[in-house]
Amino acid sequence: MTVKSTILYFTFALLISQLTGCGGGGGSEQNNNSNVSNNASNQNSTSVQNNADNNNSQGGDSNTDNSGDSSGDQGDADQGGSNQGGSDQDNGDQSDSTQSDETFSSKQQVSRFIQQATFGATPTQIVSLHEKSASDWLKAQMEQPASLVLPSVVAAAPDDPDDGFNLFHIEQTSLAFWRNSIAGEDQLRQRVAFALSELLVVSNAGGEVLTDIPEAVAAYQDILIQNAFGNYRHILELVTYSPAMGHYLTYMGSEKGNEQTGRMPDENYARELLQLFTLGIVALNKDGSVKLNSEGAPVELYNNTDITGLARVFTGLNLNEDDPEELINTRFTKPMQIFPESHSEKEKVFLGLTIPAGTGAKASITQALDHIFNHANLAPFVSKQLIQRLVTSNPSPEYTSRVVNAFESGSFELPDGSSVGSSGRGDLAATFAAILFDEEARTQAAENGGKIREPILRFTHWARAFNVENIEPKYIPQLWETGATADLGQHPYRSPSVFNYFRPGYKAPGSKSAELGLVAPELQITNASSIPGYINFMTYFVMGQQQEADVDELKEEFDEIGVEFDLQEALQSFRPNYDPLLEIADSPTELVAYLDLLLCAQQLSDQTKQNITTALSKIPSDEDDGFLPRVHLAILMVMSSPDYLVQK
């Protein structure tokens, strides 16, 4: 048996021995006791819930969220970050407040917080932030300049726009994402923007326009990145005028109705704006629970008449035509333009608001967004989903209420006594601070808490944890498309529909978590194919096979499109640094303890640690590589264990 096959054998053996009947899209149930609700003995966690429903689910499911199924069409399918290492700034010596911030009082607490707030903790962060001020770290992160996507896309565009298909240009939205998420100094901003992207979904997965014109999605990504700590109302405005969203949800070019021809305004954006981006479909209490009428049934917020009225608001928007000579790629980066002759002059009635007949497009959009933004459902609907993306899948009503208070007041007091937020409703700086510093996020949580780590976050965590060198994803073809279940099973900004990869209210069929009434959104993309796919994907990188790849074919592709190819950079790209692990690898116990803190914030159960330690002891020092095979196995077993896959 080769070293690689031995490592894979032990990794699969551990996973199979611990994996429970979590269910998932098409996966078979397995009978053991480690899942979302019970994956490690006496471990802490928090939870999240959600209410946007996905009608593009995998396998049978039970739907308990607040978004239902869409009855309309789903649409067609500064500089970038440094490429050297992760963001390790401690920013811990700036506090002038009198209150003590104990959030980072232990390395375990640092690791856990940073895993929730970024794309993964680094060894340097865990050491340097220990006993520093988490409040100062958060405020410093909010001041970090934004690492943007569009500049990279524009720089990669062919000199002659008529040159045709250019894969390197098209893939820049993905390459910039990987670079920024792993190496960006603005880690909190990047992580928050990714969370927002899973709520306000635009995808270039379907090919055609949003694939061929990457500037569109890049500009959309930058909206979320630049406004990650801004106001949700402002984001709704920018999203509404975004050509990427306009094309994706098919209201770009929507015209006023014509009774003679039977033409009606496109209703797609109106429906998803209410259902997925702002309110859901049933009334919510402040704590995120569903309001019931006198008969015990959920209270529906609107009907199709409301959608029809709101759809009139978004007529008359199309690509900017101020400069007829401007390239279409550039026009897709600018807000859509209003064409008054195409805008509906009719009265627009929805959700109790009447916009008088004859009101222009700009005023109609402003009034409509203001009315939706001030609706009582918006704060709990949005807040609960953002908790879910960062901390936990099933937050308590009290946790949700506290975050809703921060969203509505626009202010949050940090542990050091200082405040963040503009004191305006919808302030996201206050909202995300409330999510991360809440007592439920920071203290030992219920056994049923936690969230499944998304595949994207697992990979970025590995890259940051082991300080990969030369972060140039352009040299790693595997990162150009990771959405297949044979790979990660998820790719940034390429969800299969406007409902994201998974629904916030998803309950895995046949799972113990579902029996307990718990949602587990990420399990919707967990199945019999995705589990070995993830392990194989990580094995490639963990074992350094990217440094052994035959780059001749890749060089030919670069030469064909006229992109400079650096052989040494290609061979060194994403090379991990395992030196700290090799220094202690002669002791399996020390090795597991190191990885437990770095990757799991000391959440590995005693049984898991024992299983891994036993397996590692059977991997001797290699004549050529020393204990490197043992290090490889240790990382793979930890990152494949349910104790890691469930972020507590």
Could you describe each region identified by the protein language model?
Residues Q74-Q89, Q94:
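Long, intrinsically disordered low-complexity tandem-repeat segments
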Residues Q172-T173, A183-R191:
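Amphipathic interfacial helices
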Residues Y9-Q18:
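Bacterial N-terminal signal peptides
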Residues S111-T118, L200, H375-A379, S383-S423, ...:
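Flexible, low-complexity segments enriched for small/polar residues
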Residues Q99-S147:
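N-terminal mature-domain "stem" immediately C-terminal to a signal peptide or N-terminal signal-anchor/transmembrane
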Residues S17-D69, D88-D101:
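Bacterial Sec-dependent N-terminal signal peptides
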Residues S106, I126, H130-S133, A140-M142, ...:
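Active-site substrate-binding loop specific to GH73 endo-beta-N-acetylglucosaminidase modules
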Residues M1-F10:
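Bacterial N-terminal signal peptides that target proteins for export
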